[in-house]
């Protein structure tokens, strides 16, 4: 069976991204549970965790702004020129953006230190300094990371990322054991970021260091500055619409500091789970930008297929998480976090549109049509802030979840409609409907299991039963098409040799009519 080159590349990158994301998801889940149980074991601890989460979020604002401007530009134009057979210009682009990003990171850290000295809480001084210091390696690492993505070789990022997460998790565990609390957590973040940065810089030097540095032409430089500026505008809007900016209003309007913890923990957990469908969207995006350098003919089909696969991956994960939110919170975080149950349910369900928006966003960014994204982001940002003011004061974390999720849904709907009308996309809604029906069948089964079997056994049975029901539902609804079978088999070719026959049998079972023909 023949596979297209794009399918093979996307499959390979998705597998390597899966390694990175899977390791990070497991490490984050266990460390967050440990932090919640040890530091947040009483109401005072939960309040202190809320204050620390607020500081963490403030540092991520700078980090987010820095990781979407120049890094996005690096990925876009390196991919374009690498696939035009001009690696010299790609190297010049990389070195120019790396130098500028280094300056930006040092300036951002200096400003952060000044703010700490002026307005910082003395009780969190050392922790705040370490969190701000971690901005430098994180910002710098985003450039080699996107350079590797531009080359469509995500494997080069996997090992550094896993090493960084491992160091962060180990130091976090040691810190909790010795009672270093927030200083230890911040130290873990800094050490993990520093190691990941150093390793990623080394990987790029290995494959690009021998290339002669070219020249960035004035016309290209102008395009880069325009694209970078639009990317920064997009990330500012993303902080409002897609990130947890609701924390600001939550802190200002709700006197219960615990609500920040009840919002931050579920949000972080869902964000980690969202990385699973996003890893496929990311792999698709890298190939879309490379495809733009090779020719634009395939971009429309790649966009629609990317959205459908994101739905196929995200629906069971997010709906399943919402269905098991009660036993998950009570058993993993302890009964004292019961107030977090409805928040986790809301955030998980309302995050589904966020999982679907990567493909059309990448289409508009690849073709340098970010103007609508900026306009629509402004509209949705106003909606988010307005709903926050209406809901957060009275409903706390649940109000923030509703406001954030509603804005995300509106943003995703608008972006898909714009891409559909502007590019005349065939959205394949009937195929998407089959996936939604499969999700409904799975949800009904998982809810029934959690009600019949309480405790840890019920949680395990719900997860296993949900996975089985999802696969059975996909078979019953004939959700997989011929091209899906080809692509999933291509993914299977990246698995260890011993696992490949089992993968092929699973795909054949999921789509019997396609396999038979």
Each model region followed by its residue ranges:
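Signature of the first transmembrane helix
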Residues: 6-72, 109, 113, 134, ...
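Transmembrane helical elements of multi-pass membrane transporters/channels
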Residues: 12-32, 164, 188-200, 204, ...
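Helix-loop junctions and terminal segments of transmembrane helices
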Residues: 67-83, 150, 208-209, 266, ...
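Membrane-interface helix-loop junctions in multi-pass transport and translocation proteins
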Residues: 36-46, 125-126, 151-155, 165-198, ...
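Hydrophobic transmembrane helix module of multi-pass membrane transport proteins
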Residues: 99-244
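Interhelical loop/hinge segments that connect adjacent transmembrane helices in multipass membrane
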Residues: 1-10, 182-183, 198-243, 287-301, ...
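N-terminal membrane topogenesis motif
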Residues: 1-30, 86-88, 95, 123-124, ...
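Transmembrane alpha-helical segments of multi-pass transport proteins
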Residues: 26, 30, 178, 239, ...
